[in-house]
Every structure is written in structure tokens, then in C-alpha cells.
């Protein structure tokens, strides 16, 4: 598993690559606030098995990445979204034609922020957005969208996930699971295999042609 360096503004990010580049399709995996890119190590190979290279990025201040991750303020520049856009740019420089984003909790909000400005093929959020997002911002998210959340999410994300989903433009899909798990904790729940399969299949489907 090689480690790549990504320039995001004046900062250097570390990212773990699963699979090979160049590739037709790749996914950027974005971690939550209490873990880092290594937390995707058991998830990323599932994408590779479906022909999708996976780049698990460490946001600023996490596991070797320089800088510090900033706080989210709606409508303001936000470093995690900028970091995700930098990862997308690196993949395109490496010959990737279709880029998907998958983010959990903080990472899900970062993926949404990036997808408001980048022409990504698809974006998947897990337990995100945790905080409310204005409808006009959710409407800007590009590509195919899949929101995945536990109905009893311990951080109370479910209502904000639903509100954001309603404001999204199609194509879009929402999956609520019975439980209270948050972020990557969903993968360890009884419904975890079903949730993982739904996410991987959604990303691997790609665009027609």
C-alpha cells in the first residue's frame, strides 16, 4: 500500500493508495474527526475488488498531514473540503476519468463540500451531514448521491441527513438503517455488511459507457 503526498494549498497531505493508477475509476475515502485514513484499511479493498482504485486521504493535522483541520461554518471556505478537492485533482492528474467521493461524519460533510464545486461522478455520505446544511448548498452537490445513516444516530445526524437529502437534485438515494451507530461504527453493526455492499455497489456502478 503506497503512500502518496497531496498538496492542498500550502499544506502536504498523506494518503494511502489501494489498487493502481492510472485507472478509469477511483474513489476518495475521507475519514471522520476521531480517526484517520488507516480506518479505511478493511473497507478500501472492497472497492479494489470491483475495479475501483481507492485513495484514503488524511485531512490536515491527521497522521502525517501538515496543518490543522478547521471548523465548519456554512458558506465559508472549509479546509476539509479543500483537501478533498486536492485529492480529486491528484487522481485526475494520474489519469482517473471518473472520481467518486465517500466520506464518514466529518468526512461526509467534506465530500459534500467538494462535490458542490467538483464534477465528481458520485458522492456517498455516511452519517453526514451531522450539522444542518442550508438547502441552497445541498442543491449544489453534483453527481449521483447516496446518503447512508442509522435512524437513531448517536450524534443526532439523521434529521439533518434527511433535510439535506430532500434538497438534493436527482439522481439521489437514501438508506436509513435501524440502529444508533455513527460513522464507521455502522460497518460493525448487524446491518454492516448490507450497508457496505450498498456503498461499494453504488460507487462501482459508475456512469454508463
Language-model-detected regions and their locations in the chain:
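N-terminal cap/lid segment of alpha/beta-hydrolase-fold proteins
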Residues: 1-19
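Short beta-strand element of the alpha/beta-hydrolase
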Residues: 24-32
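The serine-hydrolase catalytic nucleophile loop
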Residues: 33-45, 158-159
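Conserved alpha/beta-hydrolase
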Residues: 48-69
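Alpha/beta-hydrolase active-site loop
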Residues: 72-94
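Primarily recognizes the serine-hydrolase "nucleophile elbow" in alpha/beta-hydrolase
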Residues: 86-142
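Short beta-strand/loop motif that positions the catalytic acidic residue
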Residues: 141, 147-149
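Catalytic histidine-centered segment of alpha/beta-hydrolase-like enzymes
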Residues: 180-191
